[in-house]
Amino acid sequence: MGVPRRAKLYEVKDGKVERKNPFCPRCGPGVFMADHGNRYACGRCGYTEFKDQPEPKKKK
């Protein structure tokens, strides 16, 4: 059968359980955000956070 999908979102370091992905700030604890490389996205409400935001271009 393998490992349940939800179990893959946690890892154990130094005897403590740590989340690999953040929880959605809108939906609250228990709703993980999906990791899409350059961003995290919530599948429930659609909230998106970008990991590396480029600096806005300055107008002259």
Curated annotation (Swiss-Prot):
Q: Keyword annotations for this protein?
A: Metal-binding, Ribonucleoprotein, Ribosomal protein, Zinc, Zinc-finger
Q: Which GO terms describe its cellular component?
A: ribonucleoprotein complex; ribosome
Q: Which residues form the signal peptide?
A: none
Q: How is the cofactor bound?
A: Binds 1 zinc ion per subunit.
**What Gene Ontology molecular-function terms does this entry list?**
structural constituent of ribosome; zinc ion binding
Please give the cofactor(s) recorded in the UniProt entry for this protein: Zn(2+)
Database matches in InterPro entries: Ribosomal_eS31, Ribosomal_eS31_arc, Ribosomal_zn-bd
**Biological process, per Gene Ontology:** translation
SUPFAM superfamilies named in the record: Zn-binding ribosomal proteins (SSF57829)
- Which Pfam families does its entry note? Ribosomal_S27 (PF01599)
Q: Where are the zinc fingers (C4-type)?
A: 24-45
Locate the residues binding Zn(2+): C24, C27, C42, C45
Q: Does the keyword Cell wall biogenesis/degradation apply?
A: no
HAMAP family associated with the record: Ribosomal_eS31
UniProt family annotation? Belongs to the eukaryotic ribosomal protein eS31 family.
Subunit structure, as described in the record: Part of the 30S ribosomal subunit.
Question: What is the protein named?
Answer: Small ribosomal subunit protein eS31
Q: What is the lineage of its organism?
A: Archaea, Methanobacteriati, Methanobacteriota, Methanomada group, Methanopyri
The gene name reads rps27ae
